[in-house]
Amino acid sequence: METLYRVPFLVLECPNLKLKKPPWLHMPSAMTVYALVVVSYFLITGGIIYDVIVEPPSVGSMTDEHGHQRPVAFLAYRVNGQYIMEGLASSFLFTMGGLGFIILDRSNAPNIPKLNRFLLLFIGFVCVLLSFFMARVFMRMKLPGYLMG
């Protein structure tokens, strides 16, 4: 395998560059990187790429038995289609579940008082369980009869 890596460098020659980091460029803090990761996770799981390409409406509508138009947030019976609000709601749940796991992880720090540890555990479990069960409710709204045992 080493010979395969060496073959291109038999022909190519690496330049002798002395590159320096610009003085205005600083390493971002851990919380800045974390915030960027969470925001990008929220946008990607919300289907921002799908929303840009397909341009779906923000909410849909259906006609009830009296002939009135009623707004609906979920595009039922379509697994590969979504309204914008549906994607944002699902993305919020996924992000809340992920933050719940991070809160549960942070509760294991050795220097946290007992009351704060209990509160972090409670909030973490609530976030994870709420996001899980609400995602199941969303799946029942999206595909009626799918998770019915």
UniProtKB/Swiss-Prot annotation:
Consequence when changing residue 9 to L: In a breast cancer sample; somatic mutation
Species name: Homo sapiens
Main location: endoplasmic reticulum
The protein's role, per its UniProt record: Subunit of STT3A-containing oligosaccharyl transferase (OST-A) complex that catalyzes the initial transfer of a defined glycan (Glc(3)Man(9)GlcNAc(2) in eukaryotes) from the lipid carrier dolichol-pyrophosphate to an asparagine residue within an Asn-X-Ser/Thr consensus motif in nascent polypeptide chains, the first step in protein N-glycosylation. N-glycosylation occurs cotranslationally and the complex associates with the Sec61 complex at the channel-forming translocon complex that mediates protein translocation across the endoplasmic reticulum (ER).
GO biological process: co-translational protein modification; protein N-linked glycosylation; protein N-linked glycosylation via asparagine
Pfam families: OST3_OST6 (PF04756)
Segments in the Extracellular topological domain: 54-83, 139-149
Keyword tags: Endoplasmic reticulum, Membrane, Transmembrane, Transmembrane helix
Subcellular location field: Endoplasmic reticulum; Membrane
Transmembrane segments: 33-53, 84-104, 118-138
Name used for this protein in its record: Oligosaccharyltransferase complex subunit OSTC
Assembly and interaction partners: Component of STT3A-containing oligosaccharyl transferase (OST-A) complex. STT3A-containing complex assembly occurs through the formation of 3 subcomplexes. Subcomplex 1 contains RPN1 and TMEM258, subcomplex 2 contains the STT3A-specific subunits STT3A, DC2/OSTC, and KCP2 as well as the core subunit OST4, and subcomplex 3 contains RPN2, DAD1, and OST48. The OST-A complex can form stable complexes with the Sec61 complex or with both the Sec61 and TRAP complexes. Interacts with PSEN1 and NCSTN; indicative for an association with the gamma-secretase complex.
Membership in a protein family: Belongs to the OSTC family.
InterPro entries per the UniProt record, alphabetical: OligosaccharylTrfase_OST3/OST6, OSTC
Membrane topology according to the record: Multi-pass membrane protein
Stretches assigned to the Cytoplasmic side: 1-32, 105-117
